[in-house]
Regions:
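Secondary-structure boundary/capping micro-motif
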Residues: 1-203, 207-208, 214-217, 222-224, ...
Length: 267
């Protein structure tokens, strides 16, 4: 279906050609809810329809979150086996456009990000798989580096099994309590720093993954009082090595060359 839509084919043509046993309304609904790797903007007829008042993805079913609650997260931390975790979230650009999938290492506030075509479960899983593959190419394991992940209840994170899966093992995904952004306060703080480069309301559509890597590399190069005047890059590479940072798209920025504003992208 996605290939047909990208070719500009009408839904009826796609359904008949591919002998799909679903209705047009069902496919419209799947696209709007983010179940497909396309967005409404990719399908000309859909953008003409009056949108629903709510554009949020459907909530993650409660039964799927059994064993993945914030209380489960606290329990595993209290066991003493883990001393840091990876926070995951999204940063919205213009409504209906590209978004950032962000990650923050709790022990040092090292952040990396991926540019998604849209806010969907399919895009989250696709880009997580790319990250895992990039690490694997460097003989590194995502689940070994980041055994615990914490995120909010956004519907884009609904595919728990795919998010947790890894070639060698699997990581464990947990969800904050509803309306409790303070439970992943580290990544929320870093989001305010990301806005130094991309002010609220900025569209990500004109940016590339290389642009995002550049901005986040500069952010990771900032000296922080909370890190004893070291940078997140220095702490992360001390813990995991420069190869891990490079595999995640992050490179070293000389302190005097660090930029913390949109002028980073001025030609």
């Amino acid at each position: 279906m996605s290939e047909g839509i990208h070719k500009g084919q009408h839904l009826h043509h796609i359904i008949v050609t591919n002998e799909l046993s679903v209705s047009r309304s069902t496919l419209y609904r799947y696209v709007k809810k983010g179940y497909m790797d396309v967005a409404p903007i990719d399908f000309p007829r859909m953008v003409k329809f009056k949108p629903r008042k709510s554009h949020d993805l459907p909530p993650i079913p409660s039964k799927d979150k059994i064993g993945h609650h914030y209380s489960d997260f606290l329990e595993i931390l209290h066991s003493g086996d883990y001393h840091y975790w990876l926070e995951m979230d999204t940063v919205i650009g213009r409504i209906g456009g590209k978004v950032l999938l962000t990650f923050n290492v709790s022990s040092c506030n090292f952040i990396f990000a991926r540019l998604l075509d849209n806010k969907s479960t399919a895009q989250v899983v696709e880009h997580l798989n790319r990250i895992k593959l990039d690490l694997l190419k460097n003989k590194l394991s995502f689940s070994s580096l980041f055994p615990i992940m914490l995120t909010d209840n956004g519907g884009e994170f609904a595919d728990i099994s795919s998010i947790e899966s890894d070639d060698e093992n699997h990581c464990q995904l947990f969800f904050c309590e509803p309306n409790r952004p303070d439970q992943k306060a580290r990544i929320e703080k870093n989001h305010t720093l990301i806005r130094d480069y991309f002010p609220k309301g900025t569209s990500f559509d004109e940016y590339t993954q290389e642009d995002i890597n550049l901005a986040v590399s500069h952010l990771n190069g900032v000296k922080r009082q909370s890190l004893n005047n070291k940078s997140a890059y220095e702490y992360f590479t001390f813990m995991f090595g420069e190869a891990a940072a490079k595999a995640l798209g992050i490179h070293y920025i000389e302190p005097n060359n660090v930029i913390q504003s949109p002028i980073l992208f001025k030609k």
